[in-house]
Amino acid sequence: FFSTSCGTTCRNDDVWGGDKLSYLNDQLETYAETEAKLNSTPVMLDHGYFQIGDGRLSTEEVFRDFIDKKIYVNSIEKEEPMYRWSIDYSKEQMQSAVSQGLPQVAAGCLTFYDKEGNESDAITEFAGQEAEEILGTIKNIIITERGNSGIAQSMVIYGKQGAVKVDGQMAIRQVLYPFEVEIVKQDESRVSGWSLLPSAYFYIEKDKEGAYHLYGGGFGHGVG
């Protein structure tokens, strides 16, 4: 179902909606997890006991520690190049990325807001317009919701003229269109020219110069 995990799998309903399937759970992809499943015992991590699918990774602090390897997990795929990755965007590169990525996202995954925070009808006028015409200069990007496995499910892009809420892991990966930047794998190899992020298992930081730094893991949606 996916190329490389970030150390955890994802529930099917967190990616595609619909009814949850019992055999597609969010769980740690570790040797200890396999043993825990067999013996019905939890896996011990620095933040306490992680029961299978207990949702701890949905909290931002724990998810960041997980991606930064401050929580040690003996993952089955921990040596894979795409197990961890990072992307740096300058302020201008992020503006360009969103301008190119936003028109690719299905309208049903987007909710626009005006400067006062009221829902806007910009979506009806969006076709063919640059993101800067709708949002203005991008001021910040924040992930606002994660699934139990830590997968980003909602993200808000704040602009000088308004904001847009992006829902769904695929839409989030599309809107931050990384075509003009390099994806740096954990083995320090680099790839470029991608049309979407490797996965939605990432967090984002903005520095004082206005550049954005993404730190993530895995390649694919993670269901399986």
Report each predicted region and the residues it spans:
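Conserved, single-site charged/polar hotspot
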Residues: 1-224
